[in-house]
Amino acid sequence: MKALSKLKAEEGIWMTDVPEPEVGHNDLLIKIRKTAICGTDVHIYNWDDWSQKTIPVPMVVGHEYVGEVVGIGQEVKGFKIGDRVSGEGHITCGHCRNCRGGRTHLCRNTTGVGVNRPGCFAEYLVIPAFNAFKIPDNISDDLASIFDPFGNAVHTALSFDLVGEDVLVSGAGPIGVMAAAVAKHVGARHVVITDVNEYRLELARKMGVTRAVNVAKESLNDVMAELGMTEGFDVGLEMSGAPPAFRTMLDTMNHGGRIAMLGIPPSDMSIDWTKVIFKGLFIKGIYGREMFETWYKMAALIQSGLDLSPIITHRFSIDDFQKGFDAMRSGQSGKVILSWD
């Protein structure tokens, strides 16, 4: 079958032929319809330090997708041929304390689709049936294909009560923009997002944020004053991994504020811990999606009127995958969809 693979330990990704995957007793075989390019896929394309330490070569990559069930393992229940599904990209062990306690998103033995095992940039994908999620009929293939990153946004945004709160989102990448849209949709008062990429800030404006602030040109404190905010932000969603952005967040949080961190900062990032201590801040690390509470919330948010369509900016046939990666690497895109039909 046709697949996009990391074939060489260097920059790039290549179209190749690989054998169709075999279906185990507890697996589903999924015929892929659409995939989306993740920032992780760009890291793998660029062959950065993380990729060199993590990705086996050769490897079929990709983990954002929607497809149709075309094969079912003999032990599987609850699915049928023809079901439209996406799936959780974190494969968990099922036997550690967190898995047995129902906190599967915190499994210490997680493996990743398209990272540690073959991914979805292929005509067919096999995953454990446990990881598959049926897509409601009134959710499009395009939106279903970005449920993985949307889930990161939902998990981060809904970590804390947002109703009537003032929310700061640092980082206007696709996940940050979607998190800001979720916060506004569920009833936050002011949702302010910061970045230095004007293209992506404009996407955030299209998604309905209160203010999208280019911190290279505008002072966040001035924006807060303009909005009548006298005590700081109640909730911070750190999506950038940029040390200056996190330090600004600590400066502008209200006392007792709550921060959810999805962005991955450098390991040697230094901050003024007195601001965390004397403000009584609560900081929560976010990894992936809660299984499967986040998935049900994603579907419900879209069905209740949350419009994510502006975040999908580019669509290509899989044969034009290079154009898709070029768009993602340029920084002048939202989500990029590759069609396998």
From Swiss-Prot:
Q: Which Gene3D superfamilies match?
A: Medium-chain alcohol dehydrogenases, catalytic domain, NAD(P)-binding Rossmann-like Domain
Q: According to its record, what are the GO cellular component terms? A: cytoplasm
Where is Zn(2+) 2 annotated to bind?
Answer: 93, 96, 99, 107
Q: How is the cofactor bound?
A: Binds 2 Zn(2+) ions per subunit.
Cofactor field: Zn(2+)
Annotated residues for binding of NAD(+): 175, 195, 200, 262-264, 286-287
Pfam families given in the database record: ADH_N (PF08240), ADH_zinc_N (PF00107)
Quote the subcellular location field of this record. Cytoplasm
Identify the SMART domains for this entry: PKS_ER
Q: In which pathway does it act?
A: Amino-acid degradation; L-threonine degradation via oxydo-reductase pathway; glycine from L-threonine: step 1/2
Identify the catalytic residues. 40, 43
- Which PANTHER family has this protein been placed in? L-THREONINE 3-DEHYDROGENASE
* Molecular function terms from GO: L-threonine 3-dehydrogenase activity; zinc ion binding
The EC number(s) this enzyme carries: 1.1.1.103
UniProt KW keywords: Cytoplasm, Metal-binding, NAD, Oxidoreductase, Zinc
Q: Which SUPFAM superfamilies match?
A: GroES-like (SSF50129), NAD(P)-binding Rossmann-fold domains (SSF51735)
Locate the residues binding Zn(2+) 1.
38, 63-64
* InterPro entries, per the entry: ADH-like_C (IPR013149), ADH-like_N (IPR013154), ADH_Zn_CS (IPR002328), GroES-like_sf (IPR011032), L-Threonine_3-DHase (IPR004627), NAD(P)-bd_dom_sf (IPR036291), PKS_ER (IPR020843), Zn_alcohol_dh (IPR050129)
Provide the site residues for: Important for catalytic activity for the proton relay mechanism but does not participate directly in the coordination of zinc atom.
148
Protein name (record): L-threonine 3-dehydrogenase
Family of the protein in this entry = Belongs to the zinc-containing alcohol dehydrogenase family.
Can you state the subunit structure given in the record? Answer: Homotetramer.
Tell me the Gene Ontology biological-process terms attached to this UniProt entry. Answer: L-threonine catabolic process to glycine
Q: What does this protein do?
A: Catalyzes the NAD(+)-dependent oxidation of L-threonine to 2-amino-3-ketobutyrate.
Which reactions does this protein catalyse? L-threonine + NAD(+) = (2S)-2-amino-3-oxobutanoate + NADH + H(+)
